[in-house]
């Protein structure tokens, strides 16, 4: 009887050790979601709709775009919620305290951003880079040697789209940044969510659609296209911590991007660069604060 009791104790102890080992194995070997598409994208397009609120996209009829995309209408920008600091976060993967741009002012002769950007990382891997912008101050994002082409285009969204499409079809950059100022201009002049503002959103969406169509019809290449904004607005201003100013759309489309998928993870404006680098197969600099929005890929 005593021997039988000892055997039972040893059996229970052994079973406990086996179970403990299985638990430790499960903890040390988690099943992780993929952080990148199975095939690196040939090129990436980043589109900024300056001053575009998510509810404005819905009001202007953006359902056709969301049906093709992985998206969230609850992404957040950085504070201060103004153009230059927010765009710097968009293309660096950093918050303003770490990329150093806190002011919304830049003029020719002033130094550009001092930290590496998406364009630096792409160039280091042999990708060509280009920027089509409708605000001169966004030249602050162009570090020496990081961009092969920078075009400042005056005029409405249609004109900006024409230049972007020309670059896509002729020069085929590996990373293209396109900036539309129409929503922001209409918001300051007429008020956010006013009829002229919503008309500007609709025009810009149509221009975005032309760029998307060009990417979808382009042969010999896979792509990632991200559409987002630097800030929202209320009344005729922005720059505060209010939800109307801080909430932005974040929309991804591409060869290996899920369609009609509402993103569940939290998305910040500075997640944009890590996600693009991941799609292009470019290693993430360890300094990045942003995270890859991995759930968009299949």
For each feature predicted by the language model, list its residue ranges.
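Metal-dependent active-site segment of extracytoplasmic phospho-/sulfohydrolases and closely related
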Residues: 45-46, 61-64, 200-243, 276
């Amino acid at each position: 009887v005593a021997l039988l009791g000892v055997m039972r104790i040893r059996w229970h102890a052994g079973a406990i050790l086996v179970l403990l080992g299985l638990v430790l194995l499960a903890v040390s070997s988690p099943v992780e979601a993929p952080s990148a598409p199975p095939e690196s994208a040939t090129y990436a397009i980043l589109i900024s709709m300056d001053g575009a609120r998510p509810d404005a996209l819905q009001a202007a009829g953006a359902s056709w775009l969301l049906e093709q995309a992985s998206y969230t209408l609850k992404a957040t920008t950085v504070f201060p919620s103004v153009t230059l600091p927010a765009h710097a976060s968009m293309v660096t993967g950093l918050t303003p305290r770490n990329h150093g741009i806190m002011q919304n002012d830049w003029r020719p002769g002033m130094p550009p951003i001092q930290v590496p950007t998406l364009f630096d990382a792409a160039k280091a891997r042999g990708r060509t880079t280009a920027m089509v912008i409708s605000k001169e101050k966004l030249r602050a994002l162009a570090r020496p040697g990081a961009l092969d082409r920078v075009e400042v285009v005056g005029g409405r969204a249609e004109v900006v789209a024409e230049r972007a499409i020309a670059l896509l079809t002729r020069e085929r950059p590996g990373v293209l940044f396109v900036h539309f100022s129409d929503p922001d201009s209409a918001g300051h002049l007429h008020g956010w969510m006013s009829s002229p503002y919503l008309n500007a959103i609709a025009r810009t969406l149509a221009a975005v659609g032309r760029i998307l169509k060009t990417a979808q019809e382009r042969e010999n290449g896979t792509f990632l296209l991200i559409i987002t904004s630097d800030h929202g607005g209320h009344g005729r201003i922005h720059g505060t911590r209010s939800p109307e100013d801080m909430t932005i759309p974040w929309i991804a489309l591409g060869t290996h991007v899920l369609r009609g998928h509402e993103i569940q993870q939290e998305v910040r404006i500075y997640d944009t660069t890590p996600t693009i680098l991941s799609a292009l197969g470019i290693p993430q600099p360890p300094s990045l604060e942003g995270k890859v929005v991995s759930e968009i890929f299949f």
